[in-house]
Amino acid sequence: FLHPGSHKNQGIEKGLNLIVEGLNQIDVSNGQMICIETMSGKGSELGCDLNQIAYIISNASIPLYVCIDTCHLFSSGIRLDSFDDYLDEFDKLIGIEKIKVIHCNDSMMPFGANKDRHEKFGKGLIGESDLFNVIFNEKLEGRPIILETPNDLDGYKIEIEKIRRKFHELREN
């Protein structure tokens, strides 16, 4: 997973071109998969909107993919209660097949705050319902989901059980 980085006040275009230049130096001949992670947009951070990610993917000479991070999306101003709209736009600009993995976590920070502060599943400002919108979205079926919540092993166990219960509930209905 690649956090694209920041342009450090050099401008978005220059920053994106430097990222592409760096990526073009990577040898992926052994089958490595590089996933650009969606970002929250703090400071001069890049990769917080689809146009920036599309630019990087379309200008790099190596195959690139995407990791969607729920906290980062929420913090960058993407509503997860209308996640299908985001996926439709993603598909138009980049292609939904480029999404390879989801980092699932709640957010300590309010919507659109452009700050990256992960919270335990369902304990933050995104909430369980919107996180389930992402986890159980049919357009993303079969992709791995990684819990990136601030937790210990027992906490992860509780979160996994919560998700598992919802999965079984949805299958029964």
Where are the predicted features?
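Acidic-residue sensor for enzyme active/binding pockets
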Residues: 37, 148, 159
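A structural motif corresponding to the C-terminal end of an alpha-helix
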Residues: 26-34, 60-62, 93-97, 133-143, ...
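C-terminal helical cap(s) of enzyme catalytic domains, especially alpha/beta-barrels
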Residues: 153-171
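Active-site-proximal loop/turn and secondary-structure-junction residues that shape catalytic pockets
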Residues: 4-8, 38-42, 70-74, 106-108, ...
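Active-site acidic/histidine proton-transfer and metal-coordination neighborhood
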Residues: 1-65
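Conserved, mostly hydrophobic/aromatic
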Residues: 34, 69, 102, 145
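Gly/Pro-rich active-site loop or hairpin
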Residues: 13, 46-50, 74-142, 150-151
